[in-house]
């Protein structure tokens, strides 16, 4: 039985995951808040993936190419922001790194994500005034609901869904879903002007 369930999980499609995100938020927040919250989570997930990839690239360069195995030296290089920024990758601290954020207890998750957004806004010139502030506390979701949405977003694995424009597919799904159902004052053709997906692809 367990093997069968594991197989079903492995076969879960991207569209199923994204639908589950929307379904978890059904009737729980304003349409625009749900849209912004989901897009922000996707953004944090993908810059976290880029950060991990860059970290492994740096490690590979030091160990495999340069032949250096000094642990202290490796850790020092991995902690240098310029090693990431030179390739257009955001340098993330534990406070802003997806893999750390998702370990937060459900009751503290909204504050943790809002703090991450503020930190990025303060420290990354490219993201200044680009991300919605206090969106997680503003929506006031029950801790369990936010945790379930975060868990769904965490399933979006670039290694599993091998698509050169995966984040584009995810953004398009949410933007279409919420533009179709958006309030009239939002307009039918919502175009994101704040979060630039090019910064995470």
What are these regions (language model features)?
Residues 1-197:
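Non-catalytic, mostly N-terminal accessory regions of nucleic-acid modification and defense proteins
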